[in-house]
């Protein structure tokens, strides 16, 4: 059992939870087996028709809520750096009014355990795919059938996955998670509970990698901190290794794990927004190690072994440079 635990109270639909993915990846990649990370699903919206956030104009009217939620996501993406889709959001409908299905789907993934061939499934990878499908692809992930199809892309058997989503065990875990949110007075997603040898610290809301590492260092009395190892220097070789490890990465994910400084006044979505990153990416593209492609209102970098690896044509590059 690991001494350092981080529990993330979240909802897969929450844009700030999507925006916290770079930080969670950085913790996983930099700290490795020193930390245990788990998620508690809190269900941000039980029913959009009875939900009310007057400041953001979300709740009540379904069509208006979809439009305003997309506006909020687009504005937030320039801050947190994870892209969102540029087409209209149709997340909620008269038949699908809750974010509970996405929460339940993640829990089902944790209960699923093994594929038919005995290979272990990866719930966290499915969580990321579900968040990406919701935010970037604008998929109708409130629909159980859509979620089952998404799960299939990560190795889950769709029918078994849907059966688990409907199971008592999964719904009990879901209810326990909501009860835990109530116990810790969690109303903001994401919220982080850092635990170390009986001591707990709560960080409420979207935060930076630097801030969470400061809290980790404090609660562990400096025993767990970022090492200045050569493997984490922001070199082309190290960045290539990181992208290869995950298969793909958005610019902000690379900048976060390698602690690249964001240039003031620039959107968090772009490569040129981070000091030193343009030169690294240019070198990797020239070597054929990665390919950069448009993704939503941002860009993604694919490792050369990724199924979606496809270098940009000269026409596409010219279009991007003129944008």
Regions found by a protein language model. Give the residues of each.
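Short, cysteine/histidine-rich loop/knuckle motifs that typically chelate Zn2+
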Residues: 16
């Amino acid at each position: 059992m690991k001494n350092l635990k981080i529990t993330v109270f979240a909802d897969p639909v929450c844009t700030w939870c999507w925006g916290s993915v770079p930080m969670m990846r950085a913790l996983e990649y930099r700290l490795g087996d020193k930390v245990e990370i788990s998620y508690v699903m809190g269900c941000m919206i039980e029913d959009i028709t009875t939900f009310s956030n007057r400041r953001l104009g979300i709740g009540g009217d379904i069509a208006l809520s979809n439009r305003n939620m997309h506006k909020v996501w687009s504005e937030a993406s320039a801050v947190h750096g994870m892209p969102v889709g540029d087409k209209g959001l149709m997340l909620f409908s008269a038949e699908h009014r809750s974010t509970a299905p996405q929460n339940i789907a993640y829990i089902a993934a944790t209960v699923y355990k093994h594929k038919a061939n005995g290979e272990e499934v990866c719930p966290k990878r499915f969580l990321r795919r579900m968040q990406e499908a919701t935010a970037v692809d604008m998929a109708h992930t409130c629909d159980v059938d859509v979620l089952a199809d998404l799960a299939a892309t990560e190795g889950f058997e769709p029918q078994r996955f849907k059966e688990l989503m409907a199971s008592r065990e999964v719904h009990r875990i879901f209810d326990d998670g909501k009860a835990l949110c109530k116990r810790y007075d969690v109303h903001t997603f994401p919220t982080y509970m850092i635990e170390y040898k009986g001591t707990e610290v709560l960080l409420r809301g979207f935060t930076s990698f630097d801030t969470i590492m400061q809290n980790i260092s404090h609660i562990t009395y400096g025993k767990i901190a970022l090492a200045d190892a050569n493997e984490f220097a922001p070199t082309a070789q190290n960045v290539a290794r990181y992208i290869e490890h995950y298969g793909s990465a958005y610019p902000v994910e690379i900048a976060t794990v390698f602690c690249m400084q964001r240039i003031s006044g620039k959107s968090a979505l772009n490569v040129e927004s981070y000091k030193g990153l343009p030169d690294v990416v240019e070198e990797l593209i020239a070597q054929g190690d990665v390919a950069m492609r448009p993704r939503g209102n941002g860009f993604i970098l694919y490792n050369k072994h990724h199924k979606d690896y496809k270098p940009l044509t000269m026409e596409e590059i010219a279009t991007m440079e003129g944008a």
